[in-house]
UniProtKB/Swiss-Prot annotation:
Record-listed ATP binding positions: L21, R22, G63, K66, T67, T68, E129, D130, F131, R172, Y182, R219
Organism for this UniProt entry: Staphylococcus carnosus (strain TM300)
Recorded name of the encoding gene: ruvB
Domain comment in the entry: Has 3 domains, the large (RuvB-L) and small ATPase (RuvB-S) domains and the C-terminal head (RuvB-H) domain. The head domain binds DNA, while the ATPase domains jointly bind ATP, ADP or are empty depending on the state of the subunit in the translocation cycle. During a single DNA translocation step the structure of each domain remains the same, but their relative positions change.
Ligand binding (DNA): R292, R311, R316
Pfam families recorded: AAA_lid_4 (PF17864), RuvB_C (PF05491), RuvB_N (PF05496)
Molecular-function GO term, any one: ATP binding
GO CC list: cytoplasm; Holliday junction resolvase complex
Highest taxon above the source species: Bacteria
Full protein name: Holliday junction branch migration complex subunit RuvB
Cell compartment(s), UniProt: Cytoplasm
Enzyme class of the recorded protein, top EC level: hydrolase
Annotated region (Head domain (RuvB-H)), positions in chain: 256-338
Family the UniProt entry places it in: Belongs to the RuvB family.
């Protein structure tokens, strides 16, 4: 699967770009009003008690700000943060090395925490609850257990698959926060802020247009802005105007709903090759040359969310809205223009 403009996951070359755009404190963070309000209370209370913040579980779709919030938590608590991914902690010894290097009150951020191995997870339980580790040294008859006391710390876990977490791990988080898709008005504000960080002027109409096509996801909004800025600079315009924005999005093949060429290809297949469905996922995968799991996990959730696609016991089916949007009549014609 090629990197898509509307892919919610981070592209390989985007890490430093996203880092430069991140707000550092809650007052700078746009959107997720309920989460912000709750975190303000929890953080203030923890600081009044002079205790670390309770362990925090952040979950929701990719690109909504889980990593940003973890860094904000550390900044608000005025402590250091250590960042690691679940798959990178392969053995209990890896976890012990990370935890023993923390200072009192520090934040340990584990991204993709649902991918921790069961062996590592078992070692993590007492560390979260009672701040100690039991590590087995040696093998066979010479094996012995060593207890390592740990400084109090805050674990912030992030996952796009909260349902994949085991019950015991999930229950050890005192704070559960679900990140929701952003409103278009919030995305517009994010786009304007990002443009300021990039020293680029943008008219409000362009910010609204980009927000509308960003699938409720700041990562996509910032990515689209970055590409539209390329067109603006090549045109030698003094700012990003709506005409340039619309032309750029047309060339990038991102339509009014934030659907791209792959979404159009998939819906064209269902509507025109299979008369709108129902059609099985494996059949769709073969027809468009994609893996079944990629369609199920990456492509179809947004199409279902927007009401273009329906899951039925017999397979996937295009909705009346899909026919209307894709300009397909009776499953026989398409005119996929952006």
């Amino acid at each position: 699967m090629d990197d898509r403009m509307v892919d919610q996951s981070q592209h390989e070359d985007e890490s430093s770009f996203e880092l430069s755009l991140r707000p550092h404190f809650l007052k700078q963070y746009i959107g997720q009003a309920s989460i912000k309000s709750n975190l303000e209370v929890f953080i203030k209370a923890a600081k009044l008690r002079e205790e670390p913040l309770d362990h925090v579980l952040l979950f929701g779709p990719p690109g909504l700000g889980k990593t940003t919030l973890s860094n904000i938590i550390a900044n608000e608590m005025n402590v250091n943060i250590r960042t690691v991914t679940g798959p990178a902690i392969e053995r209990p010894g890896d976890l012990a090395a990370i935890l023993s290097g923390l200072q009192p009150g520090d934040v340990l951020f584990i991204d993709e925490i649902h991918r921790l191995s069961s062996v590592v997870e078992e070692v993590l339980y007492p560390a979260m609850e009672d701040f100690y580790l039991d590590i087995v040294i040696g093998k066979g008859e010479e094996a012995r257990s060593i207890r390592i006391d740990l400084p109090p710390f805050t674990l912030v876990g992030a996952t796009t698959r909260a349902g994949s977490l085991t019950g015991p791990l999930r229950d050890r988080f005192g704070v559960h926060l679900r990140l929701e898709y952003y409103k278009e008005s919030e995305l517009k504000d994010i786009i304007i802020r990002t443009a300021e960080v990039l020293n680029t002027e943008i008219d409000e109409e362009s910010a609204v247009e980009l927000a509308k096509r960003s699938r409720g996801t700041p990562r996509i909004a910032n990515r689209l802005l970055k590409r539209v800025r390329d067109f603006q600079q090549v045109n030698e315009d003094d700012m990003i105007y709506i005409e340039t924005t619309k032309r750029a999005l047309q060339l990038l093949q991102v339509d009014d709903y934030g659907l791209d060429y792959i979404d159009h290809k998939m819906m064209s297949c269902i509507i025109n090759q299979y008369n709108g469905g129902p059609v099985g996922l494996d059949t769709i995968a073969v027809s468009i040359g994609e893996e079944r799991i990629t369609i199920e996990d990456v492509y179809e959730p947004f199409l279902i969310q927007k009401g273009f696609l329906e899951r039925t016991p017999r397979g996937r089916k295009a909705t009346p809205l899909a026919y209307e949007h894709f300009e397909a009549k009776n499953g026989k014609r398409d005119n996929f223009e952006y």
